[in-house]
């Protein structure tokens, strides 16, 4: 009889262990955007605490250096600064575009409209080319930088969100925690970066900017920018831009989310804006 009870207990323990092993797989299947929305926990007095409790992600303070006009009808999806000009890619079906802008005035100096069936996304410069992603069409567009003439295209097998370039590659986001490394000549994928915050995937990575060995990424539906190690994919810091529009007495009712990061290497400053924002901000970071 004792042996019978013992056998039953052993079977029960084995059943519980098997159920626990199945639990992580179910969690992965259900994570999706919910995991991304919870990726930044509540802030503390020092920084943003990582999910595993191992420490705090440092928050970088900023100062506003300049405020420039920005087209309030521009649904900003990509932003690059080069040689005194801004290059901006915008989205929405029927109104997606690629533009060269005067930074000081926000005036459009050159522009090309995308086909109405394409939703424009991230933008990057490579040599004499401008590369622009599209959202769900799996199509990348290539233009001449000087004349905005379309000179080619390429395909990819995921959604297109943000795009930037380091010294060797293009780096592309797709709304998950994965960054895709593309060859800038063939546009073939040659690697990936798994972005984590406190050991957990950081989802909803959007517009990107490569700055001195790190990748700055807008987190969709937030006012935050993650600072990511190019080598490890670990989040090293965070910029919280909540309230930056209100400081300029801009109503947030008519605007969409923060999106758009461009590095001004001449001034060592960062240009940031958002979808339908009437302002573009030049900020300088300083550690807390």
Summary of predicted features, one role per range:
Residues 105-143, 148-160:
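Blade-loop segments of beta-propeller domains
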Residues 140-198:
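Hydrophobic, well-structured mid-protein blocks that either form specific transmembrane helices
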Residues 72-83, 116-126, 156-173, 199-213, ...:
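Beta-rich, blade/repeat-based domains predominating
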Residues 50-73, 103-109:
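A short helix->beta-strand "capping" segment at the edge of beta-propeller domains
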Residues 101-106, 144-148, 184-187, 229-233, ...:
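Short loop/turn segments that connect beta-strands within beta-propeller blades
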Residues 65-97, 111-124, 161-162, 274-279:
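Beta-strand-rich domains and repeat architectures in extracellular enzymes and scaffolds
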Residues 87-93, 130-137, 170-176, 217-221, ...:
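Conserved beta-strand positions in repeat-built beta-propeller and related beta-rich domains
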Residues 63-70, 107-114, 148-154, 191-200, ...:
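A short beta-strand motif characteristic of beta-propeller blades
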